[in-house]
């Protein structure tokens, strides 16, 4: 449907950002299962995205592929690293198509844009075309990472966020921010309100890999780490009421 434009409101005073990148892991789509996709979970996340889209915010999305195949894990088990990474990229395309179906069932038009050419299921990545989709209020789901092995989907999300002129990256996780120690193991763990890129790197806080953090720092892209399991968590940050950690310069 080349002329489809999702009706919506212009991003106004109720949204802190007009264009954002949402990065979620592939594992977030598998619910309580140990592998693959859990359709009710995919639908729940799609509704979270729809809620933000209804605010008039332009949304870019990158989903990992770890619920299906993880390149590093395959490499550790003896596979050739480049081949394993390409297999991981294909897994992200599968997740992107699943999310596209869930979003469009809710009336949110999307485009899956792949860094690896596969014309039958996704558009090739062309920056100006992708920006035009965003301006038409279509959610752009960027798949297949950067199209190159040895780069994570965190790095791909930061790269696309920079290219798309996003104002912030939202990293959806299982916890509501960055902690000084694992909150699942330590009851006295303290959540940071803000943390710098350099502190993330020096303290190995695990927000994103070093390449992604360095690229975000270079382009002055704030990273919001929040809980994807918290209902309304994504939208609450945009309306100024959410709980999260902000990674800044």
Swiss-Prot record:
Pathway(s) annotated for this protein in UniProt: Pyrimidine metabolism; CTP biosynthesis via de novo pathway; UDP from UMP (UMPK route): step 1/1
Xref: InterPro entries: AceGlu_kinase-like_sf (IPR036393), Asp/Glu/Uridylate_kinase (IPR001048), Uridylate_kinase (IPR011817), Uridylate_kinase_bac (IPR015963)
One GO cellular component term noted in the UniProt record for this chain: cytoplasm
Pfam families, per database record: AA_kinase (PF00696)
Family the UniProt entry places it in: Belongs to the UMP kinase family.
Name assigned to this protein: Uridylate kinase
Keyword Membrane: no
Catalytically driven reaction(s): UMP + ATP = UDP + ADP
E.C. code: 2.7.4.22
Transmembrane region(s): none
Location(s) in or outside the cell: Cytoplasm
UniProt GO MF annotations: ATP binding; UMP kinase activity
Task performed by this protein: Catalyzes the reversible phosphorylation of UMP to UDP.
Quaternary structure, from the entry: Homohexamer.
């Amino acid at each position: 449907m080349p002329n489809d434009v999702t009706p919506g409101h212009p991003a106004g005073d109720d949204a802190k950002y007009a264009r954002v990148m949402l990065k979620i892991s592939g594992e977030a789509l598998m619910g309580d299962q140990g592998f693959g996709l859990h359709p009710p979970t995919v639908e729940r996340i799609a509704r979270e995205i729809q809620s933000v889209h209804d605010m008039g915010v332009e949304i870019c999305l990158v989903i990992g592929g770890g619920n299906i195949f993880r390149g590093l894990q395959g490499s550790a088990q003896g596979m050739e690293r480049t081949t394993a990474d390409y297999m991981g990229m294909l897994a992200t395309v599968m997740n992107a198509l699943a999310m596209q179906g869930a979003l469009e069932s809710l009336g949110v038009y999307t485009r899956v844009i792949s860094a690896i050419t596969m014309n039958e299921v996704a558009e090739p990545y062309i920056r100006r075309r992708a920006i035009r989709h965003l301006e038409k209020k279509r959610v752009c789901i960027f798949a297949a990472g950067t199209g190159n092995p040895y780069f994570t989907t965190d790095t791909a999300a930061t790269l696309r966020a920079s290219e798309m002129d996003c104002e912030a990256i939202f990293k959806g996780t299982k916890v509501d921010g960055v902690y000084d120690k694992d909150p699942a193991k330590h009851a006295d763990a303290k959540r940071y309100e803000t943390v710098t890129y350099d502190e993330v790197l020096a303290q190995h806080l695990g927000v994103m890999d070093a390449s992604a953090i360095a690229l975000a720092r270079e382009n002055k892209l704030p990273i919001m780490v929040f809980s994807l399991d918290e209902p309304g968590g994504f939208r609450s940050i945009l309306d100024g009421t959410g709980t999260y950690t902000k990674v800044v310069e």
